[in-house]
Design a protein with these regions (language model features):
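Hydrophobic alpha-helical
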Residues: 106-122, 188, 206-269
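Flexible loop/hinge segments that line or gate small-molecule binding clefts
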Residues: 112-151, 162, 168, 263-271, ...
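Hinge/cleft segment of the Venus flytrap/periplasmic-binding protein
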Residues: 31-42, 180, 191-192, 288-343
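Exported/periplasmic ABC-transporter solute-binding proteins
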Residues: 228-229, 235, 242-312, 316-323
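N-terminal secretory signal peptides and thylakoid transit peptides that target proteins
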Residues: 1-18
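Short, hydrophobic alpha-helical segments
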Residues: 97, 160-165, 221, 290, ...
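Hinge/beta->alpha junction and helix N-cap segments in small-molecule ligand-binding domains
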Residues: 49-62, 78-89, 110, 133, ...
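Signal peptide-proximal N-terminal region
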Residues: 63-80, 194-196
């Protein structure tokens, strides 16, 4: 049956297999049945420019990029900043351009800082995609791969309204204004305001380092023990909320809590009833799909253009957290091992 699949079908199978956890070896077997795809090609070099290189959130994204590189016969390198330093990121992007790489994926966390480098790359024939963050509507990037952050913020706000019908709530953000997380705050604030509920929300900057985020969240709670909810819009802040909720047993005091992403401390807190939910944006796909799209752009002589791709929004709650805890794999960054098929 596989022998009759055309190349487009094989590519869709590859992306789908990555999404459900198929190993690169299994996906490569699909390609081997498709008439020799891919045929011999240069070993193209792709660079991911990132704002949080050491953040555990990006472990599955890096895994996805390297899996796609192994599958397609290309090279991938990650560069940028560990502390959301936009200057370092732009410098890394310009270095990649000077090195004449074959494609750049960049998390556009600033509305204007990357515009010039993007124009330069495109002028030199280097495709530029954004992933995880898509700030700056004037940026000329070819496509965005990631979650719709404003829409996910609306969903977050709706969940806050459902859990906390009134009272004071804190919403923690690592770096206010940064384009991968600020739109989530904006969406949440709009949803809460539009609900008409008597919820007073405080937006609190928690910082870029996970340990510091927890300390800031703890200090904020201790300064206002009447808070009805603790929520966050980034992985580190959500983990910090989880630790504070656990330490002070705040669920038993009627405090609601939730946030983003699938760090182990967050998932365990949901299982243990210290957090109500977290939102998954599938970081593995945010690494895998940009490589696939840049490859196809090169392989097709620029006939297959990169396309905007929403990597989705999934609420993880007590009802479905079990499979995330029992199935540890590199696809969610909880293990270095392949684990497939996931049943």
């Amino acid at each position: 049956m596989t022998d009759r699949l055309d190349r487009g079908e094989l590519l869709r199978l590859a992306a789908g297999a990555a999404a459900v956890g198929a190993a690169p070896t299994a996906v490569r077997h699909l390609f081997s049945k498709g008439g020799g795809f891919p045929q011999s090609h240069p070993r193209w070099r792709f660079v991911f420019v990132n704002h949080a290189l050491t953040n555990p959130f990006f472990v599955p994204a890096k895994n996805g990029s390297h899996d796609a590189a192994s599958l397609l016969g290309v090279d991938v390198k990650w560069a940028g900043s560990a502390s959301s330093d936009v200057g370092q990121m732009v410098k890394a992007m310009r270095h990649a351009i000077a090195a004449e790489v074959d494609g750049i994926a960049v998390s556009i966390v600033d509305p204007t800082a990357f515009n010039s480098a993007t124009r330069l790359a495109l002028a030199r024939g280097i495709p530029v995609l954004s992933y995880n963050a898509d700030g700056g509507k004037q940026n000329g990037r070819l496509a965005y791969v990631g979650q719709d952050n404003y829409e996910s913020g609306l969903e977050l706000g709706a969940r806050v309204v459902r859990l906390c019908s009134s009272g004071e709530v804190c919403l923690f953000i690592a770096t206010p204004g940064q384009e991968n997380i600020q739109p989530r705050v904006d969406g949440a604030l709009d949803a809460i305001r539009d609900s008409g509920k008597r919820i007073r929300i405080h937006v609190v900057a928690s910082g870029v380092h996970v340990g510091h985020e927890r300390k800031k969240i703890e200090a904020t709670y201790l300064a206002n023990k009447n808070l009805r909810g603790l929520f966050a819009v980034d992985a580190g802040s959500t983990a910090g909320v989880a630790e504070v909720m656990r330490k002070y047993r705040l669920q038993k005091r009627g405090v609601c809590a939730g946030g983003y992403d699938l760090l182990p401390v967050t998932l365990r807190a949901i299982h243990d009833r210290h957090l109500d939910f977290t939102i998954d944006q599938q970081p593995y796909l945010q690494g895998f799909l940009p490589v696939l799209q840049m490859f196809l752009y090169r392989y097709s002589a620029r006939l297959v253009a990169p396309a905007d791709t929403n990597t989705g929004l999934n609420f993880v709650t007590r009802e479905n957290v079990g499979r995330y805890l029992t199935t540890r794999s590199r696809f969610e960054g909880s293990s270095t091992s392949d684990r497939y098929p996931v049943r």
